[in-house]
């Protein structure tokens, strides 16, 4: 099956994860795609194929005879799509020989604009796949799933010699728990790659350190006519907290390795309010200073008003995998050689986010991230080219060949 055929098939399944649910999977609908992938792996003849009770799919393509001593490599993608935008009833638009201009998204009437996504110019002449503007596409990360499945099929049909190849498809990556129940006792790769990036030829091995932070604010509500020196307006305290953070250290004002505080939700009234942030930085020391800044705000507010007015809860999300990859540089070297073998120069940029691979790296499985050829993830302007997906398939195959040398 062609890689784009797989993508169009997989995006027809609604697999949006639910950030309000703490179970894994966070949405039962992810099992529908999991069942399809389980069967496809069985149909390809893989061994140790299983779909777990928590919606993880695993499979093993055993080593070619005489190659059992070669290192076992793994490839991992996630089945869920981001809850940021609808992933239900996806209606892809397929544009052969794309002309390099703005694209009308016929369902919404919006345009995918070259001015907003300059990389569109590099896709001129290719077959472009977009949304119709009413949903996201789901290339994040069903493109990765499609590319892994297609690469495995081609490795088998082309009789490419290889060591053990482990395949893993996870739920709930988009809500930060995709690696929580990943079974490394079952998935016996020495190293692996998530296929969950964007640029063709990308191998990413540096990501944010990440945490979520929640300020719970308890106010004092009395009649406004008798409120002097008594009332504490929790909503106003929340505004004050937001004002104490640097206004130029938000996602809209930062790039590259610059970190940020991101206000994700603010709700409440006079009696009670809640202010939620995510905190990100590539540098570990700077990241810890950011968390200390939040703790300082909590202390300041409780000193200004009264004890227990503000309670801060910080939850660690993931760490920068660079700390692990620096001790396992061969994993990146293999990927870069594979990318060069398909005629591209490797692209390695700091990821302004995280992947399952970041968590897995700290669990003992070095796991950089490979590009899928997709862009504009998490919204209606998501798009990908067939040729970019073909390139990702080729990179996976080259990694397998190099690992078997």
Model features per residue range: what roles?
Residues 2-28, 129-130, 318, 378-379:
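N-terminal capping segment at the start of a domain
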Residues 10-11, 269-271, 346-399:
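Zn-dependent metallopeptidase/amidohydrolase metal-coordination segment
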Residues 19-20, 48, 161-164, 247-262, ...:
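Flexible, glycine/charged-enriched surface loops at secondary-structure junctions
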Residues 22-70, 74-76, 80, 91:
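A non-catalytic alpha/beta surface segment that caps or lines the substrate-entry region
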Residues 67-161, 391:
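Active-site metal-coordination/substrate-binding segment of hydrolases
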Residues 126-139, 171-295, 299, 309-310, ...:
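Midchain, well-structured core segments that form catalytic/ion-binding scaffolds
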Residues 153-175, 256:
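Short helix-loop-beta-strand segments that form the rim/entrance of peptidase-like active sites
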Residues 236-253, 260-262, 309, 319-371:
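Active-site-adjacent substrate-binding region
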């Amino acid at each position: 099956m062609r890689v784009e055929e797989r993508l169009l098939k997989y995006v027809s399944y609604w697999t949006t994860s639910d950030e309000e649910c703490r179970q894994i999977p966070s949405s039962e609908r992810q099992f529908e795609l999991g069942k399809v992938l389980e069967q496809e792996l069985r149909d390809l003849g893989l061994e140790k194929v299983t779909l777990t009770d928590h919606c993880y799919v695993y499979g093993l393509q055993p080593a070619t005879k005489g190659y059992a001593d070669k290192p076992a490599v793994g490839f991992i993608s996630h089945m869920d799509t981001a809850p940021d935008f609808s992933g239900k009833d996806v209606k892809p638009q397929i544009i052969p020989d794309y002309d390099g201009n703005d694209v009308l998204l016929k369902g919404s009437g919006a345009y995918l604009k070259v001015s907003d996504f300059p990389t569109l110019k590099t896709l001129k002449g290719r077959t472009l796949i977009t949304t119709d503007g009413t949903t996201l596409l789901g290339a994040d990360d069903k493109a990765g799933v499609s590319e892994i499945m297609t690469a495995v099929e081609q490795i088998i049909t082309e009789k490419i010699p290889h060591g053990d190849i482990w395949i893993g498809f996870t739920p709930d990556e988009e809500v930060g728990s995709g690696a929580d129940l990943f079974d490394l006792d079952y998935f016996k790769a020495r190293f692996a790659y998530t296929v969950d990036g964007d640029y063709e030829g990308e191998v990413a091995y540096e990501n944010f350190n990440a945490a979520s932070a929640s300020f719970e604010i308890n106010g004092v509500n009395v009649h406004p006519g008798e409120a002097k020196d008594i009332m504490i307006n929790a909503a106003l305290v929340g505004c004050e907290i937001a004002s104490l953070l640097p206004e130029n250290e938000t996602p809209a004002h930062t790039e590259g390795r610059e970190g940020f505080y991101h206000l994700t939700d603010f709700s409440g009234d006079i009696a009670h309010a809640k202010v939620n942030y995510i905190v990100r930085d590539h540098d570990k020391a700077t990241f810890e200073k950011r968390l200390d800044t939040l703790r300082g705000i909590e202390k300041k507010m409780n000193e200004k008003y009264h004890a227990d007015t503000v309670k801060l809860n910080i939850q660690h999300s993931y760490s920068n995998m660079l700390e692990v990859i620096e001790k396992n540089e061969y994993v990146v070297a293999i990927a870069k050689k594979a990318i060069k073998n398909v005629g591209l120069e490797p692209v390695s940029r700091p990821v302004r986010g995280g992947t399952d691979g970041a968590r897995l790296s700290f669990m003992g499985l070095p796991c950089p991230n490979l590009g899928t050829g997709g862009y504009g993830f998490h919204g209606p302007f998501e798009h990908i080219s067939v040729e970019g997906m073909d390139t990702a398939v080729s990179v996976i195959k080259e990694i397998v060949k190099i690992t078997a040398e």
